[in-house]
Amino acid sequence: MTLSSLAESLWWIIPGKLGGMRKPTADQIPTLSQIGIDALVSVMDDPSNLDLYEQTQIPYLWLPTTGGQSPTVEQIEQFQQFVDAQHALAKSVVVHCSSGRRRTGTFLAAYLITKGSSAREAIQAAQRANPQIELRDAQISFLQELSSHLGVSF
């Protein structure tokens, strides 16, 4: 897969700062910085690629989440802390799962909720950024519960 096809799979929910994509292949990992990716969050339920992230010295966080399922509130807290720390260093962060549409969309929408967006606003922002987002009912419910937990109205 070429650099341009890798760039085409990348989408930004906060332009140039926070985005999503499908899982990068081993040969793409060394080129991530060329398309503006400084740090990664893997939400795959297996540790694939983590050793490659270490070898290429790209900052990463692994928050294993089963496909079609929701993360935990604790995972969202870890995610927010990692993203905020990377942003403080002027680094962009990209989240990936297998396809970059369900778990990735859930985490990115959750981040917006932690910053004050309602669940509805966060889901709409994710869908505008990537119309192929396919959140499951459990993921939508989680985002609504997170919004309520954080005191943000629906």
Language model regions located:
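Cys-dependent protein tyrosine phosphatase-like superfamily
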Residues: 1-94, 107-154
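Short cysteine clusters
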Residues: 97
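Conserved G/P- and acidic residue-centered "switch" motifs that form tight phosphate/ATP-binding loops
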Residues: 100
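Ser/Thr-glycine-rich phosphate-binding loops at phosphate-binding pockets of nucleotides
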Residues: 104
